[in-house]
């Protein structure tokens, strides 16, 4: 259900049927399908292949500071996925201008990159590109936006999102995740001190604590666009709104227990037509809150005014029946 591959009857959706044809991990496959639709397949082939192999960046114990400094040059402060794209471009440039394989190997090592893992990354990228070609997918040549790439990633990572806990105690996990979990940002991430209110992670790793690795800042609105099939919605305080001219309610949506939005005004008529009609009759018609030039409404309002004037003149308060009887 998370990948929108099956419906509420547990039958394959159109997305599920496409995923079933791909010889890939379902999450990776879902990202690629979304990337095809978002027109960012070139970027996703790079990221998906990177997520399928061991991280090529090395951090030897005897040179941790130097390695961190080298890796920071290719880091992005909003997304670890963007850092992978920068790293790929760096590697491709080195390959393009290599003088020999030996020189290339030495060059990669000097930047604390594992030549063997880089080769694995390139090989897997080639395999994914072949699959995309066999499916007849078009790889766009123009660069995709941050939003396009991360919407596609989110399609495969909806279960790995988190929102910042604003009142978290020092040392406590700063993020609340899906289904009640809490997690920290991986210490090696450039986003450690720059992570936003909402993040998504490629993976959650349990060591001494639960950590989110390879993360990116995301917008809560993206969760609606990509995860609409998973949102649980509830509605409160249905009421007549004179300005809107209809019965409205407040909507709250959650994704795996995380509040995506709350107190959103939505039309109530489509949600509960019978109750909305009752509120309309009581608050709009009986209480005279409806703004209309309809003859029947003007007639009723005139009768109410005349009866109230009669009550005032006769000093009786029981001529006009109460709202319940009018309703």
Where are these regions (language model features)?
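Extended, charged helical/alpha-beta scaffold domains that provide interaction surfaces
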Residues: 2-10, 15-327
